[in-house]
A protein has these predicted regions:
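N-terminal secretory signal peptides that target proteins for export/translocation
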Residues: 1-6
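Bacterial N-terminal signal peptides
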Residues: 9-19
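N-terminal signal peptide c-region/cleavage motif recognized by signal peptidases
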Residues: 21-23
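N-terminal leader/targeting segments
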Residues: 27-94, 98-99
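Compact alpha-helical subdomains of small soluble proteins
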Residues: 74-81, 101-102, 106-108, 113, ...
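Long, charged/polar, surface-exposed segments that mediate recognition or autoinhibition
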Residues: 83-147
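Glycine-rich, aromatic-bearing surface loops/beta-hairpins
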Residues: 137-185
Length: 185
């Protein structure tokens, strides 16, 4: 599975976190990892369900160029992104979903971008609570992209964390999961 280069995400996340006006507040006090697990990991990416959920919540749309900078797939056939939280006492959060074809398989992705959170703690939660198995790493000048595999019901799902090389506890983290599209009845 081919993922997008790190450079676009490295550029757009700081822009998004510094320029966006306050948006609809998230209505829970869950940790960033719990939010990623609830919205992306627990049931896998669900593009249509997530789009409907975001519309119901009336989340503000994320700019298309920023959304594309967060999408982990090359050449998505559909994508949407929203500002879930910014301002107030909670850190910035964005949610992005996409669909694409990889070979002959239809896949979906779900990503969340956070600012002002602990990157090391986020990674620890992923490996300990979801038994994510490390499968590779790519490092740039200031950021690292770590790849993991989660096996669920006999299917492998790819998880990617985009983290700072030198975390300080108030970090920008982008977490993504890519899985084969599940057809809901």
């Amino acid at each position: 599975m081919r993922l997008r280069p790190m450079t676009s995400m490295m550029f757009w996340l700081p822009v998004a976190t510094s320029l966006l006006a306050p948006a609809a507040m998230a209505d829970d006090t869950s940790s960033p990892f719990d939010l990623f697990a609830e919205r992306c990991l627990d049931q896998g990416p669900r593009y249509d369900r997530t789009v409907a959920f975001a519309k119901e919540r009336e989340w503000a749309a994320l700019a298309e160029d920023i959304t594309l900078g967060i999408v982990p797939l090359n050449e998505p056939t559909a994508f949407d992104g929203w500002i879930v939280q910014t301002g107030g006492d909670k850190p910035f959060e964005a949610l992005v979903v996409a669909k694409a074809s990889v070979g002959k398989k239809a896949v979906e992705s779900c990503s969340m971008a956070f600012a002002g959170i602990g990157a090391e703690q986020f990674e620890l939660f992923l490996t300990t609570t979801r038994h994510a198995i490390p499968s590779g790493q790519q490092s740039g000048a200031v950021r690292s992209r770590k790849f993991f595999t989660i096996v669920r019901d006999g299917s492998k799902e790819a998880v990617t964390l985009d983290l700072p090389l030198y975390p300080n506890g108030a970090d920008e983290v982008v977490a993504s999961i890519v899985a084969e599209q599940q057809i809901e009845n």
